[in-house]
């Protein structure tokens, strides 16, 4: 499966080339494919905040490279560069509040910094750590793709209709994807009849990104408005809802793109299985439950305007980016460490005590 997935890879969103972070501007897809070069921590933080790059794993990877860029600038200026670098850590940490992968990656970069020995070359050490974070995410995605595909096949070996939300593919990760990685593997195994992709308002990650990724690989995909999901579950023989995650708490609650919670409620009502696919870096064992997760809200103009023109009356807008799905609505959480079925605090703790499978 690994070799087949590698051979099928066609999309990527992050490149580290000659000391520059190159990001595919996802705001312009699918009409334009524009790569932007980033040479400083401040530029990377702005790219994360402005959603040039999005998806929890991709944000974390980008932030790690941002620290490398920050260190390069601080070292060039001389003086107490380590203390000065803390400003870059703070700047990147403040770029998006909900995706825990961001903080995980920054903490890993800080820990590597603290472990440096006399004679180490700081920039080379930090660059190697950022590349390791990037590479390990790709490996995690390959492992999760296999595990998730096996869950699908275990339930039903014939081609199935699957519903997904937002974008969880190569564009959102270091490669292949989380939920879309599972879907890719299932397609290669002949387990996919059709993918139904929610358009995912207001940024339309489903219609702009997910549909684009799947169509590029020849995977049958139909786009639907978000509010059609329950109707699809009732009428189109959906067997799985498969989504990613931006943060998973110690009890198995999941924060993900707004609209995920209602998908889980509808899935339970219709007897549709619900799978969450995310690397273990998304799991925050310091938070007891989803009640503790900070939920980002974005500018209401994202709802009130189209193309910069106001289309709604002079009203306020409520624009949360994420919601929290309780663990008791989730059939399985798939990570590179293994699978947790019917997640709860005890099972999540057992998962996190395991070694990685890749």
From Swiss-Prot:
Alphabetized GO MF terms: S-methyl-5-thioribose-1-phosphate isomerase activity
Membrane-spanning residues: none
Reactions listed under catalytic activity: 5-(methylsulfanyl)-alpha-D-ribose 1-phosphate = 5-(methylsulfanyl)-D-ribulose 1-phosphate
Annotated Pfam families: IF-2B
EC number: 5.3.1.23
Top-level taxon of origin: Bacteria
Keyword terms, alphabetized: Amino-acid biosynthesis, Isomerase, Methionine biosynthesis
Pathway where this protein functions: Amino-acid biosynthesis; L-methionine biosynthesis via salvage pathway; L-methionine from S-methyl-5-thio-alpha-D-ribose 1-phosphate: step 1/6
Site keyed Transition state stabilizer: positions: 166
Active site, per annotation: 246 (proton donor)
Biological function: Catalyzes the interconversion of methylthioribose-1-phosphate (MTR-1-P) into methylthioribulose-1-phosphate (MTRu-1-P).
Protein name: Methylthioribose-1-phosphate isomerase
Organism: Pseudomonas paraeruginosa (strain DSM 24068 / PA7) (Pseudomonas aeruginosa (strain PA7))
